[in-house]
Amino acid sequence: MSATPRVRVLEIFASLQGEGINLGRPAVFVRLAGCPIRCIYCDTKYSWDFNAGVEMGVEEIVAKALALSVVGHVVVTGGEPLIWQRRGLEELACALRALGSVEVETSGAYPPTPELDRCVDFYDVSPKLSNAGVKAPFSPFYASSPKAWFKFVVSNADDVEEVERFVVAYGIPRGRVFLMPMAESPEEHGEALRRIWDAAVRGGFRVTPRLHIMAWGNARGK
């Protein structure tokens, strides 16, 4: 690892966690640059560029997060944050614990290093179904991690059936799985939620809304 680790940061902002196990929780978000997955429905396509944003040191990032005065929970997101492993992500996650619990949002394509895992409280994992338009690997590490919670982006009953097959294939505990409506606007969110409602009930899956989409659409920094 670098003696003075630096990562590329797109934005640091305070908001509510809009999805998943920490739904509605006030948090500081640290968005890192770069994603090799590139799902067709991605709502942060500006994060794909590995050279976007600005290079920042760990201490600088922590100081900016602290200045937002929202302490207790930090979400490291992207992009795909785990591409920064062994290039500063481990040091960043451990340093951010000064603010509270640390949640890492990931596609699940890459397993964490032991150094990273020690400093993460929650993995917010979003494995890619066929509706993503890409083929992405999935690390079995997350299926057995007590820190991992899963969000599947779904638009219809067929997507929910694919989630069922995925969960069974990897032995993922059903109680750790959330279905999440595919949407970029409040109107799309409501429509997708209605389409998946009955399938979620039949499959015994929890559903997470996307609060930021419901309130702000696809606005950046929310």
Swiss-Prot record:
Gene from which this protein is expressed: queE
Cofactor(s) the protein requires to work: [4Fe-4S] cluster; S-adenosyl-L-methionine; Mg(2+)
Source organism per UniProt: Pyrobaculum aerophilum (strain ATCC 51768 / DSM 7523 / JCM 9630 / CIP 104966 / NBRC 100827 / IM2)
Biochemical pathway: Purine metabolism; 7-cyano-7-deazaguanine biosynthesis
InterPro entries the record matches: 7-CO-7-deazaguanine_synth-like, Aldolase_TIM, rSAM
Lineage per the UniProt record: Archaea, Thermoproteota, Thermoprotei, Thermoproteales, Thermoproteaceae
Binding site for Mg(2+): T44
Binding site for S-adenosyl-L-methionine: G79, S126, P127, K128
GO terms of molecular function: 4 iron, 4 sulfur cluster binding; carbon-nitrogen lyase activity; magnesium ion binding; S-adenosyl-L-methionine binding
Subunit structure: Homodimer.
Catalyzed reactions per annotation: 6-carboxy-5,6,7,8-tetrahydropterin + H(+) = 7-carboxy-7-deazaguanine + NH4(+)
Cited HAMAP family: QueE (MF_00917)
Biological role stated in the UniProt entry: Catalyzes the complex heterocyclic radical-mediated conversion of 6-carboxy-5,6,7,8-tetrahydropterin (CPH4) to 7-carboxy-7-deazaguanine (CDG), a step common to the biosynthetic pathways of all 7-deazapurine-containing compounds.
Designated name of the protein: 7-carboxy-7-deazaguanine synthase
EC number: 4.3.99.3
Keyword Glycoprotein: no
Leader sequence residues: none
Domain Radical SAM core per the UniProt entry, residue ranges: 22-222
